[in-house]
Amino acid sequence: MDRGSFAHRFFCRAFSASPSFLRSPRAARRAETGQSLALGYLDIAPSALTPERRIPIGRLRLWHVVLLLLILVLPVAAQEGRLPRLDDSAQVSLITYTPGEELYQAFGHSAIRIKDDLLNMDRLYNFGVFDFETPDFYLKFVHGDLFYQIAVTPGEEEIRMVGAYGQGVSELLLRLSQDQKQRLFEALETNLLPENRYYHYDFILDNCSTRPRDVLERITGSQILERGAGNQTFRQMLDPYFTRIPWIGFGISLLLGAKVDRPASPREACFLPADLERAVQTSENGEQSLTLERRELFPPEALADSSPLLGPVWVFSGVGIVWFLFWLFRRKGHSVFPTALCLTIFGLTGTFLLIVSFWTRLWVLHENYNLLWLIPSHLIAGLWMFFAAKRQPFLLRWYLKFAFITACLFLGSSFLLPQRFSPAVYPLLAILVWRCALELFPGRTGVRS
């Protein structure tokens, strides 16, 4: 029987059997007129409310005391009865996955494992679970409204499955007292309750690595710090993970604002699974090391690397050079179409960044200085050029001067800004400067109309 339902029924019986002056006026009137009194799970007929069957006030107060004790004690007793007591030989460990092929595996993963052979229990607690079937998944992710959750899976099965996909799996056995193991187990199980399991995901400050860090800190009473990160910024810590996926890295770099260019504190540096593992290895539990030993359960398989020549820097540079050579040896007259296309693409990208940076709740996307060269109004100018053809209205010519000057200023002063930019930005800016110069100085650039 559900103990919560039992307590509710008990309360209904005590209330329905009470004297009329303890009932609400409406309930008393219903009883006097012969109507039934429906409370929760009960439907009590008027015959049950006769004076002979009412309970004396002294006994009623005693019932209220008993009721209060039941309401307070039963849920606690149920919770304690539901969770077993871990054996002294139970093992608690931090599981770390290396990066995998899929985008959501790009940074690896962290989980907590509790294994008790005596209880035949092997539970792996993951804080990075999400559902692709969530309505408007990508919109919610970008806006910062996507809920992640903690989930538990059989440890051995999960680890073998991950290893079979080629990801490396390592295990740090933790030195915890019996009381700390039990408290950790109870804390994780409490997190699994429906009202506790969901949380707002934060790419850096609240993810699958920071959650295990937080719960281990609460249990041990000590901070977990990654001192090996030095004075690196969040962006610098992410950069090595983008060498294999340069185009995705370029897109993420455009989205991330200046706030990720501040140095990460030793505690914040644990937002990456590999850094959390290093931090736990160097952390202490009281006067002893927090780690007993490290085991490599599955070695990582080599991931396919992308050729640097196919990355954004070389591709954009190559496009610019080929474009310039075609222009240099052209036979036909000048066309504004390439410049209009360039401005339209820049403006469209800037419009997207502007909307995202103001609309999102994610702090990592705020204060984006890429908007100084991906100017949203370029979109209007580019579309205008398509329709203006060779004729350049006065306002359009002034806007081309504005685009030329801002691009040149950005090229010369970007290193002074509080945000670090992808190297692929500079070939794109060089193309924009060149195309604007062709429109503004046709005689000096050898343009034939």
Question: Which role fits each region the language model picked out?
Answer:
Residues 87-167, 365:
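Glycine-rich catalytic cores of cysteine/serine-nucleophile enzymes that process amide/ester linkages
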